[in-house]
A protein has these predicted regions:
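Nucleotide 5′-phosphate-binding alpha/beta core
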Residues: 1-34, 43-46
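Gly/Ser/Thr-rich phosphate-binding loop
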Residues: 136-188, 198
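Conserved AMP-binding A3 loop
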Residues: 30-59, 66
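AMP-binding/adenylate-forming catalytic core of the ANL superfamily
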Residues: 209, 236-324
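Conserved S/T- and glycine-rich ATP-binding loop of Class I adenylate-forming
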Residues: 37-40, 71, 86, 124, ...
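AMP-binding/adenylate-forming catalytic domain of the ANL superfamily
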Residues: 321-342
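AMP-binding/adenylate-forming
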Residues: 51-59, 70-133, 173
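Conserved ATP/PPi-binding loop(s) of AMP-dependent carboxylate-activating enzymes
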Residues: 191, 200-228, 260-262
């Protein structure tokens, strides 16, 4: 972390990014780590993180959570969320307890792993799918309830999962951030100390501050780092009068239907309140009349029959405009994922045999 060694490039066993990121070629002396992004298309990019950015993120996290402690590593150590567990542990002078997730998230191992953390302040970081799985097991849920905080990132956590966590006594902290910001930089809608947030005229979220990466390895055009000190994300959001950020979704996930814009996240939140829907994803499909129509893929809850499209539309229209109600529905056993905790919407489009536009 002193900036004098070679920059590290953490990758999974099947990651094809190293060649694209020019491994072995010259890089700025202050770059400690190059973390590949999990974009769905195009050439892999690498967020160039300095030791200063990594430590600023870790220190700000501990300040927000109430102090350093011991961490349970339950995410891949080649993703930024797992990397930050290691950095936080290093700065705290502790050794993390590792839960092997190479073959999946085994909730049966969770209670003993939490016990191994010992006394004092104890934390972990998960994605929403891991949290949901743990909450279905009483022993795993009780183990999480014994932690001082469970950070949730990798995408928004469904409201039913957050409600279940609250009932189980699990202190969930919702995080927003990415590799380009050295991990989560906004906790429960509030920026960490030093982090700057603004929403531009087009609704796009921009982030700044000491946790920011020093640009990309293999920078795209246009470069979201082009404005000094800022990173323009692909996310749409709003900031309320209290300075709390709400992330509405990704700009490329927006559905243009009949001249109106529909963001998938509110529709997904409405669908998840239907008793027969265990999980879902919403996306746009090409439509000759509307431009795009709203489509939904659902995972049916155990013990329930698949709801009809008409029933789902009526359910959504209880809280949202009729434009947001799905016009097409598909049932799957599980949602395809990319990265950690992120639905692969492009795979869903291919699954339906349609096109985006």
């Amino acid at each position: 972390m002193n900036g004098r060694a070679s920059a590290l490039l953490p990758v999974g066993n099947d990651d094809s990014a190293p060649a694209a990121l020019r491994v072995g070629e010259e890089i700025d002396d202050d770059i400690a780590l190059v973390v590949t992004t999990s974009g769905t298309t195009g050439t892999p990019k690498g967020a160039q993180l300095t030791a200063a950015a990594l430590t600023a993120s870790a220190d700000a996290t501990h300040d927000r959570l109430g102090g350093p402690g011991r961490w349970l590593l339950a995410l891949p150590s080649y993703h930024i969320a797992g990397i930050q567990v290691l950095v936080r542990s290093l700065l705290a002078g502790t050794v993390p307890v590792e839960l092997d997730v190479s073959t999946g998230f085994d909730i049966n191992q969770l209670p003993s792993a939490v016990d191994e953390l010992g006394p004092g302040r104890r934390y972990t970081a998960l994605v929403a799918t891991q949290l949901a799985k743990a909450l279905d097991d009483p022993a795993a849920a009780a183990a999480l309830a014994g932690l001082d905080a469970v950070l949730i990132g990798g995408g928004p956590a469904p409201r039913p999962v957050l409600d279940a966590a609250a009932r189980a006594g699990v202190n969930v902290v919702r995080t927003y951030g990415m590799s380009e910001t050295a991990g989560g930089c906004v906790y429960d809608g509030v920026p960490l100390d030093g982090v700057q947030v603004r929403v531009d005229a087009d609704g796009r979220i921009a982030l700044g501050g000491p946790t920011l990466a020093k640009g990309y390895r293999n920078a795209p055009d246009p470069d979201p780092f082009v404005e000094p000190g800022w990173f323009r994300t692909d996310d749409i959001g709003v900031v309320d009068d209290s300075g709390v950020l709400s992330v509405l979704g990704r700009i490329d996930d927006a559905i243009s239907s009949g001249g109106l814009t529909v963001m998938p996240q509110p529709v997904e939140a409405a669908l998840r309140t239907h008793p027969a829907v265990a999980d879902c994803a919403v996306f746009g499909l090409a439509d000759e009349r509307l431009g795009q129509r709203v489509a939904a893929v659902i995972v049916v809850a155990d013990g329930c029959a698949a709801p009809s499209l008409e029933a789902l539309r009526a359910h959504v229209m209880r809280t949202l405009d009729h434009t947001a109600a799905p016009r097409e529905m598909h049932v799957v056993d599980a949602l395809p994922m990319r990265g950690i905790g992120k639905v692969d919407r492009s795979a869903l489009v291919r699954l339906t045999g349609n096109s985006l536009s």
